[in-house]
């Protein structure tokens, strides 16, 4: 049985029109990649992919990176966002590029 919830409560619970979809991403730099090259690649990733598409990235790593991508504002990532991220990483010849299915970043 569906519950009627107020807009305020739906926003607090991140449901319905306030649901936020995101996806996990992971990749690996080739062995021997310098720290400077890793920093430059991650900076370029943020400047060329994340910011222009109004995405947010929370991740970390050294040679092996993993993280979460979601929207900067309340919203839903799309399969197009996944494809843009995957394509950019693969074009840089990074290894083991993986993106997950879209999931609810608050409830999954």
Curated annotation (Swiss-Prot):
Q: Which InterPro entries match?
A: YggL_50S_bp (IPR007416)
The cellular component terms of Gene Ontology attached to this UniProt record, alphabetical and capped at eight, are: cytosol
This protein's source sits in the domain of life called Bacteria
**GO-annotated biological processes:** ribosome assembly
The cysteines joined by S-S bonds are: none
Concerning its family, UniProt says:
To H.influenzae HI_0341.
Which protein are we looking at?
A: Uncharacterized protein YggL
Q: Specify the taxonomic lineage.
A: Bacteria, Pseudomonadati, Pseudomonadota, Gammaproteobacteria, Enterobacterales
- The gene name reads yggL
């Amino acid at each position: 049985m569906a519950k009627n919830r107020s807009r305020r409560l739906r926003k607090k619970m991140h449901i319905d029109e306030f649901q936020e979809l995101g996806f996990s991403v992971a990749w690996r730099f080739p062995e021997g990649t310098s720290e400077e090259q890793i920093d430059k690649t991650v900076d370029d990733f943020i400047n060329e992919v994340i910011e222009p598409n109004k995405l947010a990235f929370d991740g970390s790593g050294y040679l092996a990176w993993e993280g979460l991508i979601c929207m900067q504002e309340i919203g839903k990532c799309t399969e197009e966002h996944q494809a843009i991220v995957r394509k950019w990483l693969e074009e840089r010849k990074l290894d083991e590029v993986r993106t997950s299915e879209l999931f609810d970043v608050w409830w999954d």
